[in-house]
C-alpha cells in the first residue's frame, strides 16, 4: 500500500486513513482539499490538474519523511488527484497519525503548505468567462500561454 500517490481516479478518503492507522496513534487528522465554486470573485466551472508524476510522488514522499522527522511517531499518507475535477470533488487528501492530536494537526497543516511549495503540480482554473493555468500551488505564478513543457527543459522549483 503506497502512502504517497498521484491518481487520475476519485480519491477514497477511508483508504488514505487506513494507510496511517497504527496502534501507537492517539489521533488521526485528515485534510480534504476540494474544488470550490468561487475563487477571487470568479465562478469556477471545473479545475484541471497536471503533474510531473515521478517527481510529484518523490516530493510527496519527501514531505512524509519531513513530517516523521519533525513530529516523533507521526506517519503521513498523501494522495493528489490529476485530470478534470468538478465542483466539490477532492483534489488532495492528507492523513496524519500521531500519538498526540496537536502533532497530528500541526503535521497535517505542514503537509498542505509543503505540497504548495515543492510538488510539481499545475492547475488550470476554468471559469464561466475564461481559463488560466496556475504555475504553482501557491498561486503566485500564472502561465497565460499554458503550462510549462518539461520536455523543453523548463523546470518547476
Swiss-Prot record:
InterPro entries: MoaE_sf, Mopterin_biosynth_MoaE. It catalyses: 2 [molybdopterin-synthase sulfur-carrier protein]-C-terminal-Gly-aminoethanethioate + cyclic pyranopterin phosphate + H2O = molybdopterin + 2 [molybdopterin-synthase sulfur-carrier protein]-C-terminal Gly-Gly + 2 H(+). Pfam families: MoaE. Disulfide bonds: none annotated. Pathway: Cofactor biosynthesis; molybdopterin biosynthesis. Keywords: Molybdenum cofactor biosynthesis, Transferase. Its EC number is 2.8.1.12. The keyword Transferase applies. Coiled coil: none annotated. The keyword Calcium does not apply. GO terms for molecular function: molybdopterin synthase activity. One of its GO terms (cellular component) is cytosol. Belongs to the MoaE family. Heterotetramer of 2 MoaD subunits and 2 MoaE subunits. Also stable as homodimer. The enzyme changes between these two forms during catalysis. This is Molybdopterin synthase catalytic subunit. The lineage of its organism: Bacteria, Bacillati, Bacillota, Bacilli, Bacillales.
Amino acid at each position: 500500500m503506497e502512502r504517497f500517490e498521484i491518481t487520475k481516479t476519485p480519491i477514497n478518503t477511508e483508504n488514505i486513513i487506513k494507510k496511517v492507522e497504527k496502534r501507537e496513534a492517539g489521533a488521526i487528522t485528515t485534510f480534504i482539499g476540494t474544488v470550490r465554486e468561487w475563487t477571487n470573485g470568479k465562478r469556477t466551472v471545473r479545475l484541471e490538474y497536471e503533474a510531473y508524476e515521478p517527481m510529484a510522488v518523490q516530493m510527496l514522499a519527501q514531505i512524509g519523511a519531513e513530517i516523521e522527522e519533525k513530529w516523533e511517531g507521526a506517519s503521513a499518507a498523501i494522495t493528489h488527484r490529476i485530470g478534470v475535477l468538478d465542483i466539490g470533488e477532492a483534489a488532495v487528501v492528507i492523513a496524519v497519525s500521531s500519538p498526540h492530536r496537536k502533532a497530528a494537526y500541526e503535521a497535517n497543516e505542514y503537509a498542505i503548505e509543503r505540497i504548495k511549495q515543492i510538488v510539481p503540480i499545475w492547475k488550470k482554473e476554468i471559469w464561466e468567462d475564461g481559463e488560466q493555468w496556475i504555475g504553482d500551488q501557491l498561486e503566485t505564478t500564472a502561465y497565460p500561454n499554458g503550462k510549462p513543457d518539461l520536455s523543453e527543459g523548463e523546470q518547476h522549483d
